[in-house]
Structures are given as C-alpha cells and as structure tokens.
C-alpha cells in the first residue's frame, strides 16, 4: 500500500515528494502502518480512522513540523505563512479522498489479490477513476482551484511580468504576486 499511496505507474505521486521523504515520515508515524495494513486486502470501504491517518501522513509529507491533521488547513498555512506556490501544496481533502481510492484499488485490489486465480475486482469507477472514453483518474469532485480561485495564483516577478507563471497560465497578476499586480500583466 505504501508504494501505491506514494505514487506508482497507475497512481499519481505527491508533487515534489519522493519515496525517500515519504519513507522517513512513515518511520516516525506508527499509526500509518495500521492504516496501510487495513487497506492491503481489498476493503469494501475506507474507514474514517484509516482516512484520517492517511490525511495526517499527507500533511507531514509537506510540513514535518505541522501539528495539524487537515490537508485543507495545511494548504492554507503553507500558502499564507510559508509563501508556497499552489503547485507545491498538498492536495485538497476532496482530491486526497480520490487519491486514496485509487491507491486502494491498485494496492488493495490489484496487488492485494494478485495471488487469487479468478479475481472479482470492483469497477474502477467506484475507486477514484472515470471512463469518459477510457479509464482515467478522477482527480476531485471539486472545481480546479486554478480556475475557481484565480486570485490565489501568485508569481514572484517584481516588474514587467511577461514570462511569469501568471502570464503563462493566461491569468492577470494580482495583489498576491510580488509585483502586487502593478505590472504589464494586470
């Protein structure tokens, strides 16, 4: 389950978080072992206790000093107090739920039942996937933050802003950018 949860060929990895970092965080988080164990044999549901342990683990992946257990709260702290770019924040709680589902499908069902001759796998659609034409990850049930919260994007340019991340994404600079929106891209 650890391998699936932290990213593999069929489950996404966490932005800028490698296996080595995840392993170190796991070594200091005993309750996580029980959570991974609960999921490794194709559970029919993901318990609240297990989901909470995985959410706490995700918070620690992005901020090892955090006392919190909510990824949404960690996102707010990392963005407002530590100046992180949105692309380096942990996933939202809704996105993490879908990530957990995909990891359980891969690790618990596909790998967990690998020695079973005739597997009876559930539909991937029940475990964080969608199939408009072919199976692909369902990232979240929420609208994409970059689209619904454009005012939260920020660049680190101090002047003209022709090549900043805001301009590249075809967004205007805002007061949250280093240029304070006082540039040629506002």
Give short role names for the model-derived ranges:
Residues 1-186:
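Non-catalytic nucleic-acid-binding/docking modules located in mid-to-C-terminal regions
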């Amino acid at each position: 389950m650890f391998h699936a949860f932290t990213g593999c060929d069929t489950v996404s990895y966490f932005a800028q978080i490698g296996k080595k970092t995840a392993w170190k965080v796991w070594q200091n988080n005993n309750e996580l072992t029980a959570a991974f164990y609960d999921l490794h044999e194709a559970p029919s549901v993901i318990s609240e206790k297990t989901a909470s342990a995985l959410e706490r683990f995700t918070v620690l992946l992005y901020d090892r000093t955090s006392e919190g257990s909510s990824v949404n709260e960690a996102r707010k702290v990392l963005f407002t107090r530590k100046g992180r770019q949105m692309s380096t924040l942990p996933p939202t709680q809704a996105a993490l739920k879908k990530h957990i589902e995909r990891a359980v499908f891969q690790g618990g069902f596909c790998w967990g039942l690998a020695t079973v001759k005739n597997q009876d796998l559930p539909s991937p659609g029940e475990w964080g996937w969608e199939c408009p034409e072919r199976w692909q990850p369902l990232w979240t049930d929420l609208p994409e933050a970059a689209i619904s919260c454009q005012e939260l994007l920020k660049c680190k340019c101090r002047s003209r802003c022709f090549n900043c991340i805001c301009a590249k994404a075809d967004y205007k600079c805002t007061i949250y950018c280093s240029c304070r929106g006082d540039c040629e891209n506002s």
